[in-house]
């Protein structure tokens, strides 16, 4: 499910992103990707139960996907492969349209559950790499 056409469709049909595993530390990949996505015009909601109530890049951090105040287009997962399964299940439960597992994050049983539930899923890729590679225009 992580072919270029699927990646393009997910990115072009996404405006609202819940970024699970968001970090306030500028040297962390989750911070850098969140910053990049925001600069591309995506509306990004940081999710991290250990940082709930804090702010990252001017956005209030929530502890769970349930606390994101709008419908979620994509859940971007910065968790390890084992923990990603629970996040995929949460994404299914809250009605997200797609799930994106970052570089190095692969969970095939979770991928199957997402597909069965009708979600698009991308594994082992980074949107901050794929957007310029595919020439995806900023969100209007």
Where are these regions (language model features)?
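Short N-terminal or domain-adjacent regulatory/targeting segments
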Residues: 1-14
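A short helix->loop->beta-strand "cap" motif at the edges of active sites that frequently abuts
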Residues: 40-42, 94-99, 117-119
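Short loop/helix-cap segments at secondary-structure boundaries that form the rim of catalytic
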Residues: 51-58, 70, 111-113
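NAD(P)-binding Rossmann-fold cofactor-contacting core
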Residues: 25-28, 35-55
């Amino acid at each position: 499910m992580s072919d270029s056409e699927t990646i393009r469709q997910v990115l072009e049909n996404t405006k609202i992103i819940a970024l699970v595993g968001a970090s306030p530390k500028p040297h962390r990949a989750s911070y850098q990707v969140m910053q990049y996505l925001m600069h591309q015009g995506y509306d990004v909601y940081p999710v991290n139960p250990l940082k709930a109530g804090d702010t990252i890049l001017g956005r209030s951090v929530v502890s769970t996907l349930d606390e994101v105040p709008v419908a979620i287009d994509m859940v971007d997962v910065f968790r390890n492969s084992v923990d990603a399964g629970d996040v995929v299940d949460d994404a299914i439960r809250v009605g997200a349209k797609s799930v994106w597992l970052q570089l190095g994050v692969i969970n095939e049983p979770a991928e199957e559950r997402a597909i069965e539930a009708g979600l698009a899923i991308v594994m082992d890729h980074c949107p901050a790499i794929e957007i310029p590679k595919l020439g995806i225009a900023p969100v209007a």
